[in-house]
Amino acid sequence: MSTGSLSDVEDLQEVEMLDCDGLKMDSNKEFVTSNESTEESSNCEAGSPQKGRGGLGKRRKAPTKKSPLSGVSQEGKQVQRNAANARERARMRVLSKAFSRLKTTLPWVPPDTKLSKLDTLRLASSYIAHLRQILANDKYENGYIHPVNLTWPFMVAGKPESDLKEVVTASRLCGTTAS
């Protein structure tokens, strides 16, 4: 998915690096394959005396046998990890900006107030419920809502919060229960 951000250029560069690493890996695989047969034959010859120790020699030789290949795969894993980290940072940046915009759209929240994401979501949900309740009660005076009626988030024009919840659940605007 293209966002047109700097991370797209970085992703393209990382893909090009992976392609180059793939070419190196193919040329190394041929070299490693020829070495593997030589090392396997030496393991078979030396394997019978080492069986008494539980095959510890084989465990130690296995990583050295794969070291040329594992170096290339480690670089590939690191590139993939860096790409995933960059995508995650970009995702978190977008999410933080969205929460900032949501916080600034909420009335009665001063700009310098530090709200957690959970608090922001709760206030937004409460404000939406408040607006639904106003629409359900049709409290318009000449197309204008009087500020006295806007007592969110505590109560709506003198009604307790329990009445507000009943109105909100009774007047769902979306979903399968909408009429």
From Swiss-Prot:
GO MF terms here are: bHLH transcription factor binding; DNA-binding transcription activator activity, RNA polymerase II-specific; DNA-binding transcription factor activity, RNA polymerase II-specific; DNA-binding transcription repressor activity, RNA polymerase II-specific; E-box binding; histone deacetylase binding; nuclear androgen receptor binding; protein dimerization activity
Q: Which GO terms describe its biological process?
A: branching involved in ureteric bud morphogenesis; branchiomeric skeletal muscle development; bronchiole development; developmental process; diaphragm development; embryonic digestive tract morphogenesis; epithelial cell differentiation; gland development
Per UniProt, the ranges with Low complexity bias are 33-45
Q: Please give the SUPFAM superfamilies that the UniProt record associates with this protein.
A: HLH, helix-loop-helix DNA-binding domain
| SMART domains xrefs | HLH (SM00353)
Q: How does the annotation summarize its subunit structure?
A: Efficient DNA binding requires dimerization with another bHLH protein. Forms a heterodimer with TCF3 and binds the E box (5'-CANNTG-3').
What's the protein here called? Transcription factor 21
Q: Which organism is it from?
A: Bos taurus (Bovine)
